[in-house]
Design a protein with these regions (language model features):
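Bacterial N-terminal signal peptides
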Residues: 8-16
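Bacterial N-terminal signal peptides that target proteins for export
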Residues: 1-9
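Extended soluble regions of mature proteins
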Residues: 23-284
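N-terminal compositionally biased, intrinsically disordered segments and leader/signal-like regions
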Residues: 5, 19, 32-33
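Low-complexity, intrinsically disordered segments with a bias for serine/threonine
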Residues: 10, 22-23
Length: 284
């Protein structure tokens, strides 16, 4: 499983409230950055002794300075990707936009009140709208796999604190058989933490979210605060390793226009089958 991270899960799961929720509703914009390093990048950045060890010490990986990583990311053929996403939140609506290359050529709008997901491509003047029924149809086309036995996850406090982007954060470590994560959480974003259970419930009801391990990771972290910085080291047996850094760079509370969450009326609406063909690399 590719570890998507509790920050991403938190944002997608945790920013909407039903009309009966008691927590203060968040409205505003959250800006995030995700940096992913592959084997080649790690070999360029780590000391030779660390690379020659039978198993790379994740602490050496987590200690790599961000400025060195970003400097290397600016060079060609470096095995590093830097993606940024902007999450705009209003009530039960969520708009996701950003720079993630070919993976997201436009933006997405999730309306949990209406129970719809829209993937919008302005360059082509089109969008795809999916409902819970569409997600169920898509999932029925994928063969079910046997559930894997996984170790019980626990969030272990590391007793470390530091300021990250103006927020006071504490560190917690979570380890599975395939990855280890150190997540820095803050208690200063309580309205985001209070909301995540409702959004998770809405996503699961729509059939959009079934990564139970990511859900469990965020639930463990949310007991202590909202994740601001997450460092994850993944190992793939003989197939190498990967290092992911996901960071909340800015949280801005402000009123947002309803137009931001509406698809232009002249855009063409495509079918689910058109979406599946696009995912398979076929043009319309």
């Amino acid at each position: 499983m590719k570890h998507t991270g509790s920050i991403a899960a938190a944002i997608v799961m945790g920013l909407g409230l039903s009309s009966g929720a008691v927590a203060q509703e968040f409205e505003g914009v959250i800006t995030t950055r995700q940096v992913t390093l592959g084997d080649r990048a790690l070999s360029m950045l780590l000391d030779p002794d660390a690379l020659e060890a039978e198993r790379i010490d994740y602490r050496a990986v987590f200690a790599l300075p961000m400025d060195r990583i970003l400097e290397l990311a600016g060079q060609s053929n470096n095995d590093i990707s830097v993606d940024s996403l902007v999450y705009s939140v209003k009530g039960t609506q969520l708009r996701v936009s950003g720079d993630v290359g070919d993976e997201m050529p436009g933006y997405a709008i999730l309306d949990f009140g209406a129970g719809t997901f829209q993937l919008v491509q302005p360059a082509k003047g089109m969008y795809i709208e999916l409902t819970r029924e569409d997600f169920e149809t898509y999932k029925s086309m994928i063969p079910e796999s046997e559930p894997e036995a996984k170790r019980s996850l626990q969030a272990r406090p590391l007793g470390q604190t530091k300021q990250i982007n103006g927020l006071e954060c504490s560190a917690y470590e979570i380890e599975s058989d395939e990855w280890i994560t150190v997540t820095w959480v803050t208690t200063e974003l309580g309205d985001l933490v209070d909301a995540f259970v409702e959004f998770e419930s809405r996503m699961k009801a729509m059939g959009m979210y079934d990564e139970e391990e990511d859900s469990e990771v965020f639930s463990l972290v949310a007991e202590h605060g909202f994740p601001v910085l997450e460092q994850t080291f993944l190992t793939f047996g003989d197939y190498g390793a990967e290092y992911e850094i996901t960071e909340i760079q800015n949280v801005e509370r402000r009123s947002l226009s309803a137009d931001l969450f509406a698809v232009p009326s002249d855009y063409e609406k495509l079918s689910v089958m058109e979406m599946l063909r696009m995912m398979g690399g076929q043009e319309k």
